[in-house]
Amino acid sequence: HYIEFIRELSVSCRKKGLVLSVDNYVPAVYNRFYNQKEQGNVADYVIIMGYDEHYAGGEAGSVSSIGYVENSIKDMLFLVPKEKVINAVPFYTRLWTGSGDNASSRAMGISEATKWVSESGMDLTWDDSVGQYYGRLDSQNGEQQLWMEETRSLGLKMDLIKKYALAGVAGWRLGLETSDVWDVIGWE
């Protein structure tokens, strides 16, 4: 039913000269019923939401590690031509408090997270395995962890978009980024 809706919507959009893009979680077994391959046949663009690798209620980790993003792009390219694929990057991160099953998190925009790191005194160290800065801090609230999204990590994601010659980049969500992010995202 979903794909039939997208088919019908695409016809109406074309008649009105509108561009139709469809956002998707990264390709996975649990979301195959969205039929990204058929979306690629009927929509102008298929967007990969290249984030929420680790999410509220799940285990602590990066919102968008570089390996996760690259694997997501490769998986989508098996289904949809590169000229129609857009990768969305996060303008946010998660501050994780606690550990194991007791971990909780809150989403923070890049600008808010940058300020929080400065005020908390958390030391960040570059982690090549995730392509992000990582920090850990013991506080009165317990262990706090952060995988920081910022210009260097977003630059690596932009490199993947160029490497695979995708149609473009999208972001979640305007207003959460710092102004220097636009220097990295600038499309050539």
Where are these regions (language model features)?
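Compositionally biased, intrinsically disordered low-complexity regions enriched in proline and serine
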Residues: 35, 52, 134-135, 148, ...
